[in-house]
Amino acid sequence: MEVDLNDRNSGIGGSDCYTLIHGTKKDWNKLWEIKTGRTEPPCLSDKFNVQLGIITEQFNLHCLTQKLLSSHKNTNKGMPIETSRQIKTGDIYDNKYIKINEGGTTIKSNLLKLQGHLDGAIYNGNDSEDMCCIIECKHTYQDNTLANLIQSYNPQMQHYMNVFNQDHAIMSGIFGNKCHMFQVVKRDHEFIHRLEAFQRFFWRSVVADKPPFDIDDD
């Protein structure tokens, strides 16, 4: 599917879902200002932690690949790639459209675009259409835990599983300069249903050109 990477304000992406689940009312309103063109999205080119994650992404995927190549289930955690599967990275994009008002029609004005851009994915064989697992890479601080990393970015992973119609995602994390760990995360239908409700509520405010919440600027 053709995706305009310069048109992120035309829908909701994975990073937006972090705000929708973990953010405050002020965070929602700030996101609304970006989506409606009132403010520019933050520039991440000088954010050290963001750029470090980008630079170490390939090494992150290398560490993950070595573990998934293992024949031991305790190491590959039930997601072996061996010779029948392969990891791909780069230019993995897709969109999914849902109704803004569930009881409404499917005309363009009632459609919300959910956007997905993956760090990587596992495919069956050489078939670029046969995806079987999403990969999300993060470089976090040394004393963080894998459980906390998954909890923080679960909205993003569940969003991607929804967009790409997948049942599994891998959180692949580098912890400071100490170690690499990963975990397979299953699709959570109840969570996705709740997330879509938040996405619809938020996007209705974008369409109406009215902030999601009336709050004092204190």
Sequence positions of predicted segments:
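Charged, glycine-rich intrinsically disordered N-terminal tails and low-complexity linkers that flank
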Residues: 1-59
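Nucleic-acid nuclease catalytic cores
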Residues: 68, 72-207
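Short, contiguous clusters of charged residues that form electrostatic/catalytic patches at enzyme active sites
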Residues: 30, 62, 155
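Signature of the catalytic double-stranded beta-helix
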Residues: 53-74
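Helix-loop elements that line ligand-binding/catalytic pockets
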Residues: 207-218
